[in-house]
Amino acid sequence: MNEEQAVLNFFAQKENLPLALSVANQVDGTRQKLNNDFWLALSERIVASTPDWRVSTTEDRNATESLVGLYLQPEAEQKLYLRPMLEQQYLGDTLRIYYGLMWSAEPTLEQKQLSVIYTLHNTFQEAGFKSNESFLAWQWTSYYPRSMDFILRFSTTADALLNEATSLIQNLLVSHRDALHAANTALRESSRSAAISVVSLDKLRVNLER
């Protein structure tokens, strides 16, 4: 019997349950810290390699001290845009990281049908990405951030893992740089036009009431 199995057998004994639960809590805390460390380190890598974007981390809605991902914002301020992102999501009883392009707000049907948006959507579909109401494109990665393999790899060869994860965003930005820029520009202009139309309609109503 090896040492690891001997330890597991020790904790499996009923009289050792209090100690086993205490160790489990300690391990959960370590997993959470390493998970946060991963997202913070990845965010720093992406900030250094993508000067044209602002990078923000994403917190768990139910636990603000827990980081679950990151996303990129264009330098130009706008409410509606497509943002590159990576995030961890529960898949059954484990967590898995996915990435892609997420809508920053709900687009109108007309905005979804803009030619640059339609073309970009088709490009990602042909590359094997999925889409839904929240995402123009998304795809699972091979990363399970709470798994033993992932945690040990991050603890021993963090640079290699972070470089791999960073390359997912970098490849997306490089491969679709012009199309993504055109899409976000079109969304900004369409939102501005819609706002102008609303203001003009309000002025018309005021004039009619006089």
What is the role of each PLM region?
Residues P107-R210:
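Ampiphathic alpha-helical segments that act as solvent-exposed interaction surfaces
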Residues M1-R45, V174-L180, N184-A194, V198-E209:
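N-terminal domain-onset segments
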Residues F10-F150:
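Polyanion-binding interface signature
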